[in-house]
Amino acid sequence: MTTKITGLVKWFNPEKGFGFITPKDGSKDVFVHFSAIQSNEFRTLNENQEVEFSAEQGPKGPSAVNVVAL
């Protein structure tokens, strides 16, 4: 079972399609790509938006998957 993590969007660039989430547990910032955002609308995030996600190890560090805005 995958652990769900909550955090706040540190920043997200909709033109480039990626950004970073700061987990509420104080752990290292997590990379997020627009393709990981679960939405039927335009896949973007806003600074300081609260989200829930799972983390996987990506090629350059932790990467968010199954990102849902709260």
Swiss-Prot record:
Q: Which CDD domains match?
A: CSP_CDS
Q: Which residues form a coiled coil?
A: none
| Gene Ontology cellular component list | cytosol
Annotated keywords: Activator, Cytoplasm, DNA-binding, Transcription, Transcription regulation
> Where is this protein localized, as stated in its record?
Cytoplasm
Look up the domain of life of the source.
Bacteria
Q: Name one GO molecular function term.
A: DNA binding
Q: Which cysteines are joined by disulfide bonds?
A: none
**Chief place of localization:** cytoplasm
The name on file for this protein is Cold shock-like protein CspJ
Q: Which residues form the CSD domain?
A: 7-67
For this protein, the record's Pfam families field holds: CSD
Higher taxonomy: Bacteria, Pseudomonadati, Pseudomonadota, Gammaproteobacteria, Enterobacterales
Which gene produces this protein? Answer: cspJ
InterPro entries tied to this protein = Cold_shock_CspA, Cold_shock_domain, CSD, CSD_CS, CSP_DNA-bd, NA-bd_OB-fold
